[in-house]
Amino acid sequence: MTKNFIILTSNINYLERIIDNDLFKNKALVDGSFTTWVVAINKDCPPWLTTNKSIAIRITNHPVVDELCLNLGGPIISTSANCSNQKYINDITTIENIFDGKIDCIVKGQLGNEKKSSIIKNILTNEILRH
């Protein structure tokens, strides 16, 4: 199964070229939960980034993501390290063994405090896509 990209950022201003920040600020930032939001892309979003006119966005305060975004001057593009319908993986050795030779880079650092995957919500409908 092909997984869609997730945009991770510590700074909402980095999203200006990808999504409508006003809607995102008004809805997602008020929520405050550990949530990934599916939002409509704007006309400036690179076409290779999505196939369905929407993209997943997660604002995070994780120090490793914050440092990466700061050094790159923008958000980072990620995907899930978990296989569909499989147990949540949070051990780097297990990830390296399962995805041997299939991942270009693994950034080593402390994991966040969350014990499960984030909730995924559609920002327009508030529909929960994953709980």
Go through the PLM ranges and name each one.
Residues 1-131:
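Active-site-adjacent structural elements in enzyme catalytic cores
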